[in-house]
C-alpha cells in the first residue's frame, strides 16, 4: 500500500465519496507576488498596490536556471542532493526531468535554489500568456520550506525577466509563515478586491 496519495482538481460532486473513504479534502492555499516594476495590469483585477509581503532579503540565495542537459547530468551525479529528508513526498532529479522537461504539452522552466553553492531546492515554473500579458506559476517545489526564506529579490528578478504581472503558487503543507518570509501574500477566499484568475 502507498504511504501517500494525493490529487488536485477533483469534482465537487465526488467530495462526499472521498470523505466517506477517509480522505482529507479541502482547498489549496493560493499565494502570489506582484511585479514591482509593473504599473499597467491586464490580468490582475482591482490591484490595491500591495506587491508582496515585506521581508528580509537574503543576498546569499539565488535562482539558477537549469537547461535539459544540466538537469539530466544531475540525475547521474550522486554528489548532488537536496537536503530535504523531512519532505513528503520524496522526489528526485529524474522525476523533475521526466515530469517537466519531457511533458508532451506544456513547456516548463526548472530553477535550482542555491545558498552560496549549496542546492536547497528545485522550482518548476510555467509561463502563462494571455494576449500581450504574462503571469508565472510555480507548479512544483521540492526542498526545505525554509530554503525560500528571503528569496523575494529572486522572485522579483524572475518577474522582470519574463515581464510578468505576478508569480503565484498553489500548495498545501508549506507553512504560511515560511512563504510570507519569501514575500508571498496569501490570497483570502473571502476577499473580492483583487482578482487573480484561476488557470488550468
What are these regions (language model features)?
Residues 23-24, 60-64, 69, 108, ...:
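Short glycine-aromatic motifs
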Residues 43-74:
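Conserved N-terminal entry element of GNAT/NAT acetyltransferase domains
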Residues 2-55, 115, 122-149, 153-200:
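Active-site/acyl-donor-binding loops of N-acyltransferases
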Residues 1, 59-61, 117:
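Intrinsic-disorder/low-complexity loop/linker signature
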Residues 7-12, 28, 64-144:
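A conserved beta-strand-loop-helix scaffold within acyl/acetyltransferase catalytic domains
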Amino acid at each position: 500500500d502507498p504511504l501517500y496519495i494525493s490529487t488536485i482538481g477533483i469534482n465537487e460532486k465526488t467530495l462526499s465519496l472521498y470523505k466517506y473513504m477517509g480522505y482529507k479534502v479541502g482547498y489549496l492555499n493560493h499565494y502570489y507576488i506582484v511585479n514591482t516594476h509593473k504599473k499597467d495590469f491586464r490580468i490582475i483585477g482591482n490591484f490595491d498596490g500591495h506587491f508582496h509581503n515585506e521581508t528580509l532579503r537574503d543576498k546569499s540565495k539565488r535562482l539558477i536556471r537549469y537547461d535539459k542537459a544540466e538537469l539530466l547530468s544531475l540525475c547521474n551525479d550522486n554528489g548532488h542532493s537536496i537536503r530535504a529528508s523531512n519532505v513528503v513526498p520524496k522526489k528526485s532529479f529524474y522525476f523533475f526531468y521526466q515530469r517537466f522537461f519531457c511533458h508532451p504539452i506544456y513547456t516548463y522552466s526548472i530553477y535550482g535554489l542555491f545558498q552560496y553553492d549549496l542546492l536547497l531546492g528545485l522550482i518548476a515554473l510555467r509561463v502563462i500568456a494571455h494576449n500581450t500579458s504574462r503571469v508565472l506559476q510555480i507548479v512544483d517545489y521540492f526542498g526545505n520550506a525554509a530554503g525560500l526564506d528571503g528569496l523575494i529579490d529572486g522572485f522579483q528578478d524572475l518577474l522582470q525577466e519574463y515581464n510578468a504581472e505576478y508569480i503565484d503558487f498553489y500548495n498545501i503543507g508549506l507553512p504560511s509563515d515560511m512563504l510570507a518570509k519569501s514575500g508571498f501574500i496569501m490570497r483570502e477566499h473571502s476577499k473580492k478586491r483583487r482578482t487573480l484568475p484561476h488557470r488550468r
